[in-house]
């Protein structure tokens, strides 16, 4: 079975074609600047051969048509025709309270995704555009929605409820949902394998650190607490997001600066985080370099980022009643030795110690803790696309079995 994995954003579309026989990516691609001038599609084959093409991409449907052309290209493609694509897996950011697992897409699932538009206005609408475009181009091909929020449905009510009037939850669904679930699920599963223990016996804290960052406490393979909340704004400080702050700060700034609700939302989501504190960049490589040259605001931004995560690790050790491993993943978590070192400094009192040389290794699964550490520290490159492809394959095969078992 070959599964096409789609992650449709507002002006971009990431994709992978995965051969599920050996779970290998045949091609990885990206459409950029959809609906904007100077659109481009890039695709890299399993053998390293690369396609790069500037072309007009006015909408997601045209972008997906270009994806199919790239995948079937006589020189750069990996399949002869679109018929070789057996199923499509779509990343959908928000499933609300309706989905605790991935789902075969039908009219009811589509409507439920649309019902969550107001919960994820920046993500669900383009996710849905990706689904609709695929349905037009590939009619009859089974499609599966894999939700970022689904993994966190095992968080108990006392952890996901906010101490607000209960009627607001009943009316508007205001509660913690959590995000990056596909990534947290994948690395938690890999952590159990690396530890050589059954999933049900493992307690891990997974740190998905990128421009958006979230931490999750995983017990027995299930999420029991996470930092992101009603939206991805809650939690630790991030690249451009402020993370958790005193809520009273919001009306105070609005009054003092004369900001509208849209403007304060933009300030907290796009102008804050390490970018806001440093007044320099949301790229941690730039901040590292600036801090090493004595830029105090860059150093402060990095200190805040690391401290907030360190504090959550302590909280989650209490929530889990002990921990087997701390896992680092995603762009920063996988690649920044300096950030990992900052976060884990002075935690030897709770059994966390890292090997300086192992910590410098990049791009592979590795245990970077010292032999005498009682808590393992694991770096695990995430693979959300493979998780989406696995769910898609499982659901499609189950559907085929169900249909074949129905008497005629």
Swiss-Prot record:
It is found in: Cytoplasm. Pfam families: Acetate_kinase. Its cofactor is Mg(2+); Mn(2+). Mg(2+). Can also accept Mn(2+). Substrate binds at residue 91. One of its GO terms (cellular component) is cytoplasm. Homodimer. This is Acetate kinase. It comes from Methanosarcina mazei. The gene is ackA.
